[in-house]
């Protein structure tokens, strides 16, 4: 890690501690009883798990040591994931808060992540916000055996395939088409009031977009209702941040529910390298 990255860590630490987040430091390697996730055996045959996701690490730590307490932490360290046969280390800065009590908790996380990403990357950055409640509402009207197919097509914004599926199965997928069209052509928050959304979803998106536009007038805020299909635990408001100068995803996060408990978190992706 270079000097500029240390400056980013210090800047992030300053913002997080001002909001009451405590540091979270645990080893990336832990002894394991059985293979799970990313793991390896040392020369003596000891099995170790490798940290691949900070949210899971934080939740497991809380479950093990303080299951009934609130945890509100910031972190700065590597996660390890396989890309093909290569183990890749990615340095992340992030926040986690469990339990999540209100939308204000999510906006607090969003504020720190967006402010930091705006400073760390050349930009300008684009913040995309979505909501998993969109899928929950849409799927009520669709046969269960088609859920995964429809969700995959929403993922890829594939309007042509949605129209074909609607014709072949003789089911009305016009609301799905509208959600995809809105996510392609009507991404400005000003269109939220005319979108076909559950009231609670619309209110969350309006609150989050208004908050961001007021706090960060130079940041572009867009609505993408097709977000978050890749992380099953997401449940509620979600976001991604893109750096337009490098054309890459630089941060992501949102609300989640794990084992019936609500939380919120977000991560900034600083550095990736093959181990």
Swiss-Prot record:
Keyword match Cytoplasm = yes
What cellular-component terms does GO give this entry?
Answer: cytoplasm
Report the domain of life of the source organism: Bacteria
Is Amino-acid biosynthesis found in the keyword set?
A: yes
Q: Which SUPFAM superfamilies match?
A: Class II aaRS and biotin synthetases (SSF55681)
As for subcellular location, the record says: Cytoplasm
Gene3D superfamilies hit by this protein: Bira Bifunctional Protein, Domain 2
Q: What Gene Ontology molecular-function terms does this entry list?
A: histidine-tRNA ligase activity
Coiled coil ranges (UniProt) are: none
Q: Please state the pathway this protein functions in, per its UniProt record.
A: Amino-acid biosynthesis; L-histidine biosynthesis; L-histidine from 5-phospho-alpha-D-ribose 1-diphosphate: step 1/9
Its keywords, alphabetically, are: Amino-acid biosynthesis, Cytoplasm, Histidine biosynthesis
Primary place of residence? Answer: cytoplasm
According to its UniProt entry, the protein's GO biological process terms are:
histidyl-tRNA aminoacylation; L-histidine biosynthetic process
Q: How does it assemble?
A: Heteromultimer composed of HisG and HisZ subunits.
Q: Further remark, if any?
A: This function is generally fulfilled by the C-terminal part of HisG, which is missing in some bacteria such as this one.
User: Known PANTHER family for this protein?
Assistant: HISTIDINE--TRNA LIGASE, MITOCHONDRIAL-RELATED, HISTIDYL-TRNA SYNTHETASE
By sequence similarity, the record places it as follows: Belongs to the class-II aminoacyl-tRNA synthetase family. HisZ subfamily.
Q: What does this protein do?
A: Required for the first step of histidine biosynthesis. May allow the feedback regulation of ATP phosphoribosyltransferase activity by histidine.
The name on file for this protein is ATP phosphoribosyltransferase regulatory subunit
Organism annotation? Thermotoga maritima (strain ATCC 43589 / DSM 3109 / JCM 10099 / NBRC 100826 / MSB8)
